[in-house]
Amino acid sequence: MSTVTITDLARENVRNLTPYQSARRLGGNGDVWLNANEYPTAVEFQLTQQTLNRYPECQPKAVIENYAQYAGVKPEQVLVSRGADEGIELLIRAFCEPGKDAILYCPPTYGMYSVSAETIGVECRTVPTLDNWQLDLQGISDKLDGVKVVYVCSPNNPTGQLINPQDFRTLLELTRGKAIVVADEAYIEFCPQASLTGWLAEYPHLAILRTLSKAFALAGLRCGFTLANEEVINLLMKVIAPYPLSTPVADIAAQALSPQGIVAMRERVTQIIAEREYLIAALKEIPCVEQVFDSETNYILARFKASSTVFKSLWDQGIILRDQNKQPSLSGCLRITVGTREESQRVIDALRAEQV
């Protein structure tokens, strides 16, 4: 009699999965953490809700109302979740039939779209971006049959550039009545003029992902948002967990989205953008740096001579960057989060000393 192992009992698609390599999972013993696009210093909050004996609201009223006001949408168009990552998964669970439907995304881009789909047993289709990292609209059009959700990250992680708005419009027309288009705006606070929130009335199949992890400096809170028309939000409410946000998370999120919280966030954005420009200018003068790409975000993508050697050398000095070599069209590329001036200087000095 053959022995069935625990692994044999698992779903076949789960047995074949590779866990997503988050920045934290990759580890390292650094003291300069520039690999996860976090804000470099902690922001202090005091808890005001002392009701931990009670279950929280599924969609905390203060959080929803504050975010709706900030984003310029109606409260009925907002869903709050455990980070934007949960929003990615909820959209697949609500709209994709496992073993039948597909999602589509355009690498090089954020890795969680594929992880979420594969976990659920939904097919992933990819249409690599063009040489300038803009959408290959013809390629997308050719692969749309059977696709229910299309993910587009703008500004794109890890390349840092915005997707051409006219291309977004073309994509939304191509998918009308066929698929949900998800604009991942995790980094939109660094270029707010490019947000698609004003398009929701025009496109009922548009959904927008947002987060408090970047400009709001709350990556450890795990709080994100999906903005969409009420019909989409109502469907997502059918598949979301009953208590996605703990009471302390909702408490801090509401404070971060208060008028004072928004002002503080905008000050952080101004400071990070100034630091980004300083770091870009310095990187362009360093011999081992072959190319520095423009960025609309809180990180910089650059191509290096002997990038693996450079990555390991900085790692050994406690400076942890994000290696993008395995992504399509990103050979030799490392991604550097914009940190404090001291952290920028550590990176600059270490790179200047590289003999490659």
UniProtKB/Swiss-Prot annotation:
Record-level GO BP terms: L-histidine biosynthetic process
NCBIfam families cross-referenced by the UniProt entry: hisC
Source organism superkingdom: Bacteria
Source species of the chain: Escherichia coli O139:H28 (strain E24377A / ETEC)
InterPro entries in alphabetical order: Aminotrans_II_pyridoxalP_BS, Aminotransferase_I/II_large, HisP_aminotrans, PyrdxlP-dep_Trfase, PyrdxlP-dep_Trfase_major, PyrdxlP-dep_Trfase_small
Name of the protein in its database record: Histidinol-phosphate aminotransferase
Enzyme Commission identifier(s): 2.6.1.9
Catalytic activity line of the entry: L-histidinol phosphate + 2-oxoglutarate = 3-(imidazol-4-yl)-2-oxopropyl phosphate + L-glutamate
Gene responsible for this protein: hisC
Modified residues (N6-(pyridoxal phosphate)lysine): 214
